[in-house]
Amino acid sequence: MYKRQVQIRDAVSVPVIVKETGCGIAAEQYELLLEQGFTAFDCAGAGGTNFPAIEAKRQGVELTEEFAAWGVPTCWSLLDAQQTLPQNALLLASGGIRSAGDAARAFALGADAVGITAPLLCLVMEQGIDAAADYVEALAEELQKYMLLLGCLTPKELRDVPLIVTGETRDFIASRGYELAKLCRWRRG
């Protein structure tokens, strides 16, 4: 498994980031990728751009709503990463990140960086590159406000903010056997 990815990694002289395409990376996949020597990941969870749906549309294939929603949500993929990845792994969060609040939550869950695609592409297509640049600037300013309210100077410090977890995410944590209280107090790094 992951033979082609290993070949690519071994053939290039730059770091390789393993990126999911809208379905998230679960703990089991993180473990397999770690065994192959990968240390950088973009979880690209369900909730953002769904590449299987894009490919199906391109091929003229109809997807059921259930299949189109398939995947591990970004939040859950980040929680799996916390429990699986070593401290020195690079973890990027994308998939459904649309606001500064989404970005702050991703940083709080251990992401080293976040990726935002759909809102930017829509702005570029509908209003031009300047509108997209304004969006990024406003997002950065709003993220700074979240950090100020939480007493953080950097996005990485958001990992130290205690979490409150409810609903399906709390159920996910329990189903994985993760220790909720510990997870809410400490995240990667």
What are these language model-derived features?
Residues 65-89, 98-189:
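Alpha/beta catalytic cores of nucleotide-metabolism and tRNA/nucleoside-modifying enzymes
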Residues 21, 45-48, 118-120, 151:
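Short, ordered loop/turn segments at secondary-structure junctions
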Residues 11, 36, 109-110:
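Structural motif
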Residues 1-2:
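Short, small-residue-biased leader/transition segments that mark boundaries at the very start
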Residues 6-32:
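Internal active-site segments that recognize and position negatively charged phosphoryl groups
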Residues 27-80, 84:
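Catalytic core of soluble alpha/beta enzymes
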Residues 17-25, 90-101:
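Glycine-rich beta-to-alpha transition loops that act as phosphate-gripper elements at the mouths
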Residues 15-17, 40-42, 90-92, 113-115:
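Structural preference for beta-strand elements that scaffold enzyme active sites
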